[in-house]
């Protein structure tokens, strides 16, 4: 497949349909939906064809795939296009490194970096690898790479410093952030709004609210990076966390004034933060502003708004918005359904919750593990453990949306095992264990100890219990070992 740089116009409608694909590549890949399976299928079809595509369009598509977390398709597109003659800039190589690390794990990313020509080992590729280390919380490797960059006289960008400071906030090492700020200044590296935001968050983590306010003052004095809406959303969130409601409201007012471009994410922050302040009237006011600014309201917007209304105990308002969304949605998002199901369950309105659960599949909604978890929690609290186990079994069988295993919380498992022990219900305890085994191979003492106590309380025996413990490689405590003499006759 030949590749070309776009020299003048990027108007894809002016392509010759004999040579080039008839529609934007990104649109073609998402023709059948945004799931990774569908995107991979469309990508494979495109790569089997003979149509040409512009280099800028490949880059734009890779960027959009990355933004949606579709790293494997983005990597495959990048690799195949290179095989077919697309020359990679150092910037392209930095992006490719990031994709390799995310699609094939960090070691593959390291190997890609090592194999790059020395001319490609610039701040861009070093910075990309550093960011990968930070994402994986590999502090020692990240710090080592930063030191190596300094030894090679490669000045890190603000993005590299931002990545490392974000790493410190995630690992609870916020005390290292001020030193990074001082180093950044000493290197004459231009900070950006993210730099200031992560600095503010680090100070807030140590309850240094006056320090946070000094950062804003410094931004205003410096003048190179003006506080934007993200700065004030960050500030408002910090004030809310600190219980400083009046200051939080003032920051939110600043946020509104800074949102001149009517940014969707800014509206989301406003709704969430006014909700955390308990300002229901303001929540509705911002919702109306969002609807005026962006008439085609997305599922994500409805999800956030309904969640906020539920937290503010405005169930009638949440129901009204749900009906509005349901009447106009193109995709029946089960996450939104789950919010209302959860609200009904919380209020004890289990019939309404069940009605929603039954209607969802008819509208194209796919019940997920969260749906069944909500019902499981309700039945556990209601003492209906048989139904709780049924719901748990369904949640485990569905698993997580990303393909991972779903398991109930340790608190739920303890509550169930405690109940079965009190009721001397051996069958219930064994059923729970079997359900858990469908989701994990790691059944430990926290399950077997109450199981053995349940057998003992019920006056029942399990001749092979010691063998089970040995097979599962489980070591129980001394008190449980004594009960084994009653429960198990095997040696």
UniProtKB/Swiss-Prot annotation:
Alphabetical UniProt keywords: Mitochondrion, Repeat, Ribonucleoprotein, Ribosomal protein
Stretches forming PPR repeats: 122-156, 157-191, 192-226, 228-262, 263-293, 298-328, 333-367, 368-402
Domain of life: Eukaryota
Coiled-coil stretches noted in the UniProt entry, renumbered to this chain: none
Location(s), subcellular: Mitochondrion
Pfam families recorded: PPR (PF01535), PPR_2 (PF13041)
Record GO terms (molecular function): mRNA binding
Main location per the UniProt record: mitochondrion
GO cellular component: mitochondrion; ribonucleoprotein complex; ribosome
SUPFAM superfamilies the record matches: TPR-like
InterPro entries noted in UniProt: Pentatricopeptide_rpt (IPR002885), TPR-like_helical_dom_sf (IPR011990)
Oligomeric and partner information: Component of the mitochondrial ribosome large subunit.
Family: Belongs to the PPR family. P subfamily.
The protein, known as: Large ribosomal subunit protein mL101 (rPPR4)
Organism: Arabidopsis thaliana (Mouse-ear cress)
């Amino acid at each position: 497949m030949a590749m070309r740089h776009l020299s003048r116009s990027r108007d894809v409608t002016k392509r010759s349909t004999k040579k080039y694909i008839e529609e934007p590549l990104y649109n073609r890949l998402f023709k059948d939906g945004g799931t990774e399976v569908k995107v991979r299928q469309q990508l494979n079809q495109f790569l089997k064809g003979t149509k040409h595509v512009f280099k800028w369009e490949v880059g734009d598509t890779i960027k959009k795939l990355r933004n949606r977390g579709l790293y494997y398709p983005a990597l495959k597109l990048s690799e195949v296009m290179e095989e077919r003659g697309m020359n990679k800039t150092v910037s392209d190589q930095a992006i490719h490194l990031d994709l390799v690390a995310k699609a094939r794990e960090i070691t593959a990313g390291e190997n890609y970096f090592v194999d790059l020509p020395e001319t490609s080992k610039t701040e861009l590729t070093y910075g990309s690898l550093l960011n990968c280390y930070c994402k994986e919380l590999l502090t020692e490797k990240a710090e080592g790479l930063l030191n190596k960059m300094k030894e090679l006289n490669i000045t890190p960008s603000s993005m590299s410093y931002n990545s490392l400071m974000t790493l410190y906030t995630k690992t609870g090492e916020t005390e290292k952030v001020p030193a990074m700020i001082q180093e950044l200044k000493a290197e004459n590296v231009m900070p950006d709004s993210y730099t200031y935001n992560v600095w503010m968050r680090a100070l807030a983590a140590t309850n240094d609210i006056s320090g946070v306010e000094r950062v804003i003052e410094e931004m205003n004095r410096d003048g190179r990076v003006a506080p934007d809406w993200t700065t004030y959303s960050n500030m408002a969130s910090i004030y809310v966390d600190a219980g400083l409601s009046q200051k939080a409201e003032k920051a939110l007012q600043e946020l509104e004034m800074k949102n001149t471009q009517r940014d969707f994410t800014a509206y989301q922050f406003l709704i969430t933060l006014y909700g955390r302040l308990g300002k229901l009237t303001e929540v509705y006011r911002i919702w109306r502003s969002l609807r005026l600014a962006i008439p085609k309201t997305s599922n994500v917007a409805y999800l956030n708004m309904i969640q906020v209304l539920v937290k503010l105990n405005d169930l009638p308002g949440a129901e009204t918005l749900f009906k509005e969304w349901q009447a106009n949605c193109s995709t029946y998002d089960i996450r939104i359904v789950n919010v209302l199901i959860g609200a009904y369950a919380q209020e004890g309105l289990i019939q309404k919750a069940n009605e929603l659960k039954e209607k969802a599949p008819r509208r194209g909604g796919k019940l997920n593990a969260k749906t069944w978890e909500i019902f499981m929690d309700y039945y556990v609290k209601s003492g209906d453990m048989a139904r709780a186990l049924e719901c748990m079994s369904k949640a485990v069988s569905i698993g997580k949306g990303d393909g991972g295993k779903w398991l109930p919380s340790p608190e739920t498992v303890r509550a169930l095992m405690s109940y079965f022990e009190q009721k001397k219900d051996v069958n219930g305890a064994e059923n729970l264990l079997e359900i858990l085994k469908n989701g994990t191979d790691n059944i430990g003492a926290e399950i077997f100890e109450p199981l053995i106590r349940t057998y003992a309380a019920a006056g029942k025996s399990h001749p092979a219990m010691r063998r089970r413990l040995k097979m599962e490689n489980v070591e129980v405590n001394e008190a449980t070992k004594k009960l084994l003499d009653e429960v198990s006759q095997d040696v």
